[in-house]
Amino acid sequence: MLTKSKQDPHLNHILNARHHDPFSYLGLHQDGTQYILRLFQPFAARAWLQTASGWVPLQRSHEAGLFEWKGNTPPPVPCRIRLEENGHSWETYDAYTFWTTLSPEELYLFGEGRLKQAYRTFGAHLCEQQGVAGVRFVVWAPNAERVSVIGNFNHWDGRMHQMRVHGSSGVWEIFIPGLTSSDLYKFEIRNRQTGQILVKTDPYGFSFEQRPGTAARVTAHGHYAWQDAEWLEDRARADWLHAPFNCYEVHLGSWRRDAHGEFLGYRELAHQLVPYMQEMGYTHIELLPVSEHPLNESWGYQTTGYFAPTNRFGSPDDLRYFVDQCHQAGIGVILDWVPGHFPKDDWALARFDGSALFEHEDPRLGEHQDWGTYIFNYGRNEVRNFLLASAHYWLEEFHMDGLRVDAVASMLYLDYSRKEGEWLPNRHGGRENLEAIDFLKQLNVMVHEDFPGALTIAEESTSWPMVSRPVYLGGLGFSMKWNMGWMNDTLSYMQHDPIHRRFHHDKLTFGQIYAYSENFVLPFSHDEVVHGKRSLLDKMPGDTWQKFANLRLLATYQMTASGKKLNFMGNELAQGREWNVNSSLDWHLLDLHWHQGIQRLHRDLSHLYRQVPALHELDFDAHGFEWIDCSDSDQSIINYLRRARDGSFVLVLLNFTPVLRSGYRVGTPLAGHYREIFNSDAGYYGGSNQGNGNGLQTEAYPWMGHSHSLVVTIPPLGGVIIQPG
């Protein structure tokens, strides 16, 4: 009996956890007229099988834990067994007597890169198989000799639940009976070429244990009762191109913390953050990545769980509750999503089955030297499918209203941040990443077809053409693109002392040359208030009064310029310090009138932007903007019209010097009475109350190419919005 393993290579492979097809040996098999059940339970002292005539003992045929039963009549399948360990006995079913439930169609579509809902196939799924409740595990590891599920249910022993491989697909599967929600698990993988043993978390894991642990957690689905059907119906019908979009960019872990400095949960945030956004007039929130990530300081941009909300703030259903509350409050939710790179943590995607599976082998294609991360191999169908399924998952399962795609420029260019000799050209000899381009197009087509009204927004920092134009017209297919050029020019201009701004006037005007080449978002994002760049307030020149006046003027310019809007949390408070991911925003600043004034200004501008069609309807159309005068560099003044689709308009006048400009004549296309509907210099905002509060009447005095004109007061470092009527 003790020499059996020497005579049986199958058993040797089981004992050494090297069997490529354990189902061919373990479980129930027919040998001529006889049936054999083989059971490997290394921690069991004794085992029994339930047959039609009752419980019968299994023979221990190898001291390492192999039990066998032989009989002429097959037992009921799946086979029910009883095990005894350390004097304790329990009943379960033999995992090797369950049939496969993977269909050839699923495997085919996955191999083609077209299994959009791969998250319903891969990962760990609570289910009932052949009348027995348990969990089905599926993972892709084509270069593995053997894959096992290990967890708190099998002593984390890779010999116990060795999986079934489905031919050349590289897809491994096993159903383990009796497991329940919250069981922890990983995959143990033996590489076919090297014999290296790797312990990996689930790429399709739906939730994970608390840090620093890295195990995935079996998670139940489908129990949350959504209340946002009306929102989704309205979203599908909405004309987002002509609708207001004023987005509040938020890192959930540092927006606000509790009295002990600990994270607020998704549900607590729903009850604090959502009412705040309503009060402030935001239309959307953009969440910095909430997909699972190990390091706070990565801000979520080094993702290890592409299908798992981070458990820092609660469960997946808690995040669903947060999104649901946003929708019921009329606020859309955009998820920051990171398909451009992934971290090198040895327990996650990196070298997943001992080979460069999700990434390229060659570091000239497969590594971001700047970030110390790997680049996805977009040309591999299964990798592309993984990412497409991730995007689909967040939109389908969490009702997200769109994706902000991070670092698109790094995906588009093979030579991104690389020196000569550090990159490989494409098949045409160029520097464009053709596989990434195809992936992005496929992503955008999928989102727009499957989720009507959902948005895709590109953080793309180059002049790549047609990023936000439809794929059928030759574009990448994004809904919108961040206008990094406008943002950089504007912040550069604002940091100059007002006395020198006259020499940099083109930074205010140049953006109109390309403003309608894309559907642009004007972003003052988290990237502008970290890593020594200083807070927006600290960028502003001058004394305290001038700093706050400049900041009020900057917000007025952003909210009246062509393009949708985005501000990082804290911009509306006039944070004095840079953003710190490990602490809350400085809410105590609102005890000071300067900061209170900035918050009031942001709130009033947000509501005005939503209420006045001229400020949002034609953000992407040159007909929505007209320069009245863009050439007054000597006085650092610009003024322009913003128009709505019905021809109604507002007049915007901005003064970028601390000099009061009274008696300033400006042309206007319409005679009559005008009123000031916004003034950044109002005392309510902390300003000096210089303006046009009594209204204005045009004069039949041609000016600036128009038949009529107004004589206005433009406050120092201030902006006013004037409307006919």
Swiss-Prot record:
Active site: D406, E459
InterPro entries xref list: A-amylase/branching_C, Branching_enzy, GlgB, GlgB_N, GlgB_N_E_set_prok, Glyco_hydro_13_cat_dom, Glyco_hydro_13_N, Glyco_hydro_b
Assembly description: Monomer.
Protein's job: Catalyzes the formation of the alpha-1,6-glucosidic linkages in glycogen by scission of a 1,4-alpha-linked oligosaccharide from growing alpha-1,4-glucan chains and the subsequent attachment of the oligosaccharide to the alpha-1,6 position.
Protein's name according to its UniProt entry: 1,4-alpha-glucan branching enzyme GlgB
TM helices/strands, residue ranges: none
Catalytic activity as recorded in UniProt: Transfers a segment of a (1->4)-alpha-D-glucan chain to a primary hydroxy group in a similar glucan chain
E.C. numbers: 2.4.1.18
MF term (GO), any: hydrolase activity, hydrolyzing O-glycosyl compounds
Pathways per UniProt: Glycan biosynthesis; glycogen biosynthesis
Source organism: Methylobacillus flagellatus (strain ATCC 51484 / DSM 6875 / VKM B-1610 / KT)
UniProt keyword Transferase present: yes
GO biological process terms held by the UniProt record: glycogen biosynthetic process
Protein family according to the UniProt entry: Belongs to the glycosyl hydrolase 13 family. GlgB subfamily.
SMART domains from the UniProt entry: Aamy
Entry GO CC: cytosol
UniProt keyword terms in alphabetical order: Carbohydrate metabolism, Glycogen biosynthesis, Glycogen metabolism, Glycosyltransferase, Transferase
